[in-house]
Amino acid sequence: MNQEIMNLFNPTTPAQVFDQIRISIASPEKILSWSYGEIKKPETINYRTFKPERDGLFCARIFGPIKDYECLCGKYKRMKYKGIICEKCSVEVTLSRVRRERMGHIELAAPVAHIWFLKSLPSRIGLLLDMTLKDLERILYFEYYVVLEPGLTALKDRQLLSEDEYLKAQDEYGQDSFTAMIGAEAIRELLKGMDLEKLEASLRVEMQETDSDIKHKKLAKRLKIVEAFRHSGNKPEWMIMTVVPVIPPDLRPLVPLDGGRFATSDLNDLYRRVINRNNRLKRLMELRAPDIIIRNEKRMLQEAVDALFDNGRRGRVITGANKRPLKSLADMLKGKQGRFRQNLLGKRVDYSGRSVIVVGPELRLHQCGLPKKMALELFKPFIYSRLDAKGLSTTVKQAKKLVEKERPEVWDILDEVIREHPVLLNRAPTLHRLGIQAFEPVLIEGKAIQLHPLVCAAFNADFDGDQMAVHVPLSLEAQLEARVLMMSTNNILHPANGQPIIVPSQDIVLGLYYVSIMREGLPGEGKIFGDMAELEHALHAKVIHLHTKIKYRWQGMDETGKVSTRWIETTAGRVMLGNLLPKNPRISYEIINKLMTKREISGVIDQVYRHCGQKETVIFCDRIMALGFYNAFKAGISFGKDDMVVPHGKWKIVDTTRTLAKDFEQQYNDGLITHGEKYNKVVDAWSKATEEIAKAMMKEISATKKTASGADADINSIYMMAHSGARGSPAQMRQLAGMRGLMAKPSGEIIETPIISNFKEGLSVLEYFNSTHGARKGLADTALKTANSGYLTRRLVDVAQDCIITQDDCGTKLGIKMRAIVDAGTVVASLGSRILGRTACEDVRDSSGKVIIKRGTLMEESHLDAIHQGGVQEVKIRSALTCELVNGICGKCYGRDLARGTPVNHGEAVGVIAAQSIGEPGTQLTMRTFHIGGAAQLNEQSFVESNFDGKIVIRNKAIARNSEGHLIAMVRNMVVAIVDADGTERATHRIQYGSRLHVDEGDTVKRGQRIVEWDPYTRPLLTEVEGTIGFEDLVEGQSISETLDEATGIAKRVVIDWRSTRGGSDLRPAIVVKGKDGKVLKLARGGDARYMLSVDAILSVDIGAKVAPGDILARVSTESAKTRDITGGLPRVAELFEARRPKDAAIIAEIAGTIRFGRDYKNKRRISIEPMDKTDEPREYLIPKGKHIHLQDGDVVEKGDFIVEGNPAPHDILAVKGIEELAAYLVNEIQEVYRLQGVLINDKHIEVIVRQMLQKVEVTDQGDTDMISGEQVDKIEFDALNEKAKEEGKKIATGTPVLLGITKASLQTRSFFSAASFQETTRVLTEAAVNGKVDPLEGLKENVIVGRLIPAGTGASMAKIREVAMKRDKLILDEREKQAAVVSPAPEAELPALPPAE
């Protein structure tokens, strides 16, 4: 009885406790064990009584009562009859909730195939039986018989027979001499009769014997599925169903609408079809109907079951009454609207509201303004409870009334309730974790939420109508997490790069910039002030100006913490700013005693955060915000038309460029340059002109003008806005007052005629049209970009979601080397910036060999100076890529938590942070693919200047002096280095083939001196020997054509594709250099002086011409060598993460050796490499014709050199150079795209993602393990199996790492939940079921899906505590068992001492 009473108040059944979930194929017995009864009728509910029909789809006898504790006929009502089964209507008296849990079943009259195992590729049934899908369908859909048992006849096992052949065979051999069947029964018999163990053994033998690659792959696939069935305990015949489960009725409800109609779930329709056809089939079989009718009915039953499980996978989609496809069971799970993504991974929550946001400049950083109306609604339950506690109301109803009337005491209580109760603000789209932050609410009038201006950058919010959502954390734990982890004051640094994100912008920056200006010659210059009061007095009395240069007695703090005083030259404005700085010995006045631009302010905030901590930083930020706003208002900076100054020299520059463009046109007409070259040169000239005009304009605008009295005049307002970083950029100013410049077409090409006017002068009609042309594409791009960027983020999160910091140190000795990234001679990422916050993997030594940083040290800002001064060129650091933990990453390999500036904590979800950091700036990236030629990424570099003073050192030197007396680079791998006085290398430049050097080995250079230059638009072919020119196989009309440029009538000789001309297939066009005797000269490196020509080469020499080494024989315009598009922006990032092979992939030399040209095929050229290492095999490469090969016979290549230029395929880099090189390549390429947009992302984020892409190993030799060579195995699994083999003394397997794209890697994670909720749900679940996969619930997604705390953050520590508790429980239970075993009435043994808590 007591139990019953207890149940009254606690009707919930305890949740199942589990730590793994397994998925497998359900056997017919299993389905029957779930079922509470068979459904025999297709009826749902009675149209008059609205009660469910007996044995129908909603039957109360099978599924349970409709009302709580009430049977259908109403004989038994209420709790006291709980558990009784009514004798009249056979309904159990219980909770109606069981209708959500109880299942039914349908006994099928004929077996049917489960469509997922039949049609989901690869077809599992087909693989097991080794039959094609086409044949299977012919059997299943009753077209062909299949021979099961040929007996003594001439038929073969599993031979297909058509109706006629079957009858003929019966006539010929007699009815019982062989067995052949048709339909699902036949397949079921075949599957039932399989001996998997025997099959596995024979497949293994066959695999060892076969030589064919294709056959090996096919056998491996089959072997894998056979093993899967053997190990999972699934039986193959279960893929053919004899019983169909029916899901509980409340999960496919029938809802009455007003007007007496019903809305029903599509599943009911689908089940109805199955039941109808099944019943009809039963009746026909009882009636002994003709075979043809029964067969047709069986086929229809198969189709009905197919539609129920996966509508539209086979045949046409079954539609409902309104021509809409019915939603089958598979559709319930699939896609954005499916169960996984709609309800399990994304839920709507209560206690939330949303409203428009407005600016709240008087708020503190940790506050937000919450409208009273919203607060009242959100905190209602809290208010009710307080009213009750204070005795102001006795019932909830009374409290409700009080609140509705908005009585004064309610407002007082609301104040109490929200005090120190943080709320979460969220702005969609939440692209990174800073899109949700916690604030303390401040009650305000009005209906809009007030937001602090400094957090706008993190939310990416502005006040043009943005809305934000408010969520209330209810439980104490939630409030604690909100306050400790999510409070806006805790999110000062950006997780992507560790820079401050609480940075003033726009008017604040403008105000601070204005405050910090210093001008010469203003009243009161040179006056001396002792303290702030004097200064303010003087300002009010207008004795001095805010910008006057003055002397001030500054009180700072020295190293000991004592106050120190000194005189400084500054301005009144800067003193105001200095007074806001926290007092700290490491923070000097100098950091603000300069013109404060946005960048400078960010630097100051960073310094304050590093030296003074979070609290001081927050106070400082609030103060400078107030100062900035106030002074922006005081300054009265405006935007006037006269502030846009059109430079005086504009038209002169325009005219010169016009003449230049005319010259190029003329050169083209004279045939000196090609059309492509002319286009490039014209575009270049106009780019330069635009730049020059912009420079002239900036010079005029930024120049300090003098007033009549000789003082500095006010600075130009527009210049102030752009220079301070408040709004606008030099590029926009150029369009306002310089010239608009070149415009792009929607295709990305650049229009040759520029827009010469600017917006101040106004555009002509033609110019206006040209400018709208490209701008429209920009808008269309933006819309596409958002979707694409979101999808990239989703894939990244999915691949990295289970990357969590699980330990402090994995103890690995591995790491990756970091160097500064130098692009075209300028350092784009210094060594210091790349290793900050990472752990040293080895001792770092300076150039003298002294250890300056010990291994295992986390690099702080202080270490960077030591590295810089020590002249260290590269540092080996720990990386996520080389971390040896099985699950997750260790803290040492990850390094510093960028958002906190401290070593990373346990349980930090670094994978998700990495994904967000890379995905969030995705919307800022461009979408376009650049076509070469055009100012989009022009300013092609054509020279290198020295950035340092020093001496020249040349490595791999090969220089020739050509007939004009210039030094020419003759090899591709020559490097020029600049070494300073100490012998430290300051810069290295790789020199292009054919470049002209201005310096030689040992020369001294000054900073800014030109070292080399080259023609960026052509690739030359140079001779290495002196002699006379001869031609080989250059036949007019076959391999060479004198093309007359149609515009000019001037001839130039171009090599044409000789293989496509008649009789030209055997030609090998070349230029040879002959000696005095008329014979072809020999080269020093071996081989003849014969230079093969590629298609589109333009000859620069004639027969009989004299040449010197280094002279150009022919040139290939890079137009044709480089017509490939440069994929830029988002598509490039996606391409790299997906590890796609680029369209024109570079061909990489797998070994070091000598190039040899072999015999050519019809449309391929054969190149082989003779290895240096004689034990190696030579490698052959086939290269499509028309590809420009810049190597000659006899050239020496290193391992990893490019044989054909292009983007290398990441897989090739991994295969040839290994993981470290691959990581370096991917990190640099991805960073380059982001760098172009000025987005900073720390390398470690990209490394985390790349680590996830390298989780698989391809087995090359299976050894004595169960693995199959050629299959891809998880690294962890691979190591585990090898360990096992080692212990047993067997031969271990070998494998090579494989690079998977992020989509593929997500689908191949160990967790099937995670993969199924990502993409291709059916395929993933089918495969998981066949393999009987177990999901260990280790990642974040799986745990969210099953409704648990995620194993990261606070969830990780909870998991740890739970683990300890379970260990202790086990100890106690074991001890109890021991005591129970000792039956003797001895005194109870002491309980064991508990292990100390971890």
UniProtKB/Swiss-Prot annotation:
It comes from the Bacteria. Keywords: DNA-directed RNA polymerase, Magnesium, Metal-binding, Nucleotidyltransferase, Transcription, Transferase, Zinc. Mg(2+) binds at residues 462, 464, 466. The keyword Cell division does not apply. Binds 1 Mg(2+) ion per subunit. Residues 1377-1398 are annotated as: Disordered. It catalyses: RNA(n) + a ribonucleoside 5'-triphosphate = RNA(n+1) + diphosphate. GO terms for biological process: DNA-templated transcription. Zn(2+) 2 binds at residues 810, 883, 890, 893. Its EC number is 2.7.7.6. GO terms for molecular function: DNA binding; DNA-directed RNA polymerase activity; magnesium ion binding; zinc ion binding. It holds the Pfam family RNA_pol_Rpb1_4. SUPFAM superfamilies: beta and beta-prime subunits of DNA dependent RNA-polymerase. Residues 1380-1392 have a biased composition (Low complexity). GO terms for cellular component: DNA-directed RNA polymerase complex. Its cofactor is Mg(2+); Zn(2+). CDD domains: RNAP_beta'_C (cd02655), RNAP_beta'_N (cd01609). Belongs to the RNA polymerase beta' chain family. NCBIfam families: rpoC_TIGR. The RNAP catalytic core consists of 2 alpha, 1 beta, 1 beta' and 1 omega subunit. When a sigma factor is associated with the core the holoenzyme is formed, which can initiate transcription. This is DNA-directed RNA polymerase subunit beta'. It comes from Bradyrhizobium diazoefficiens (strain JCM 10833 / BCRC 13528 / IAM 13628 / NBRC 14792 / USDA 110). The gene is rpoC.
